[in-house]
Structures are given as C-alpha cells and as structure tokens.
UniProtKB/Swiss-Prot annotation:
Residues 1-30 form the signal peptide. InterPro entries: SecM. Belongs to the SecM family. It is found in: Cytoplasm, Cytosol; Periplasm. Keywords: Cytoplasm, Periplasm, Signal. Regulates secA expression by translational coupling of the secM secA operon. Translational pausing at a specific Pro residue 5 residues before the end of the protein may allow disruption of a mRNA repressor helix that normally suppresses secA translation initiation. It comes from the Bacteria. Its main location: cytoplasm. GO terms for molecular function: translation regulator activity. It holds the Pfam family SecM. Transmembrane segments: none annotated. This is Secretion monitor. One of its GO terms (cellular component) is periplasmic space.
C-alpha cells in the first residue's frame, strides 16, 4: 500500500490512476468467475451428482493449486464494469498519446510540420495501441506431422569400410540390409 501511495505521489493522479486501473482490470481478467466475487457454491446444497459441479464449488482462494489439476472447462468471465474500465482507460490513453498539435495558421504550418522526438514517441505508442485494439486474435496453429529431411551421412573416416575395402577383412553379413 505504501508503494502505491509513493507512486501516486511521484507520478501524480493524471498519470498514475489510469495505469493502476488498467493493471487491476488486467489482473482480474484471468481470474475464474468463482474467485472473482461470485458466492462460493460449496455452501449451496448439491442436489445433482455432477462431478464438475463439485469440482467447481471446491475451489476457492485456499485451494488455488487445485485449479491446475482440475480437468474442467474454465469459466472465465468479463463483466460489464471490467469492459467499461478497459474502454475508459484505452480512451484516456489514446487521447493522452495523440499529438497535441492545434490548428495552425498558414505561417505556422512549416513549424508544425517539424516533428519533435517526443511527438514521434507518442505517435509510435498510439500506433501500437491502435494495432493492439484492431488486431484479430488467431489461435496458434499446431503442426503435428513434420518430416525431417533425411540427409545421407557422409563420413569420410569409417574404419570398418576401410578394413573391408583395403585389407579385405569383413565382419558382419555379406549383404547390407
């Protein structure tokens, strides 16, 4: 808590609060719905004998390690307020990163065309944010059948072949398989 207050004092409200909000929302996106505020279903009497319902209700903060071993479909949920917070933070970031160039008169057009390094960085961040927002997620493809290129082994030094060819000594079958 002290660290958060120190960061707030160092960076100020305008910079720190949107990033804190984004971090909190992003951290809560990966939490299953039974850990993110939904009442524990273990207290509800189990009328069905479904194993998945028992597994679902058995997990809470004291048994987070069981989540890894459970074979069930994950129930990740994003509620309205998380979506609203994400939209708000993205809107704030896009306005904060947009170049602050006012409408210039004809005389100031030449000065406005000279881009400062801070504006280049802001434009790069804005382009990255736009790319993240418009990127269509594609699940990774699994390549299962790959054939390795079979290269003939060309070893120059094979003592068995040398003995068979030069000395006439043969060890093993007469025909190669």
């Amino acid at each position: 808590m002290i660290g958060i207050l120190n960061r707030w004092r160092q960076f100020g409200r305008r910079y720190f609060w949107p990033h804190l909000l984004l971090g909190m929302v992003a951290a809560s996106l990966g939490v299953p719905s039974n850990l993110s505020g939904v009442p524990d279903q273990a207290a509800i009497p189990n009328t069905s004998s479904s194993q998945s319902r028992q597994n679902y209700g058995a997990t809470n903060f004291s048994s987070l390690a069981l989540l890894h071993d459970m074979h069930r479909r994950p129930s990740f949920s994003v509620d309205y307020w998380q979506q609203h917070a994400l939209r708000t933070v993205i809107r704030h970031l896009s306005f904060a990163l947009a170049p602050q160039v006012a409408y210039a008169r004809v005389q100031e057009v030449a000065e406005a065309e000279q881009v400062q390094p801070s504006q280049i960085q802001q434009l790069a961040l804005l382009n990255t944010l736009n790319a993240l927002l418009t990127h269509e997620f594609k699940p990774p493809t699994i390549i299962r059948y790959t054939e390795q290129i079979k290269r003939p082994v060309l070893s120059l030094h094979k003592p068995g072949l040398w003995l068979a060819q030069v000395q006439g000594i043969r060890a093993g079958p007469a025909n190669f398989i």
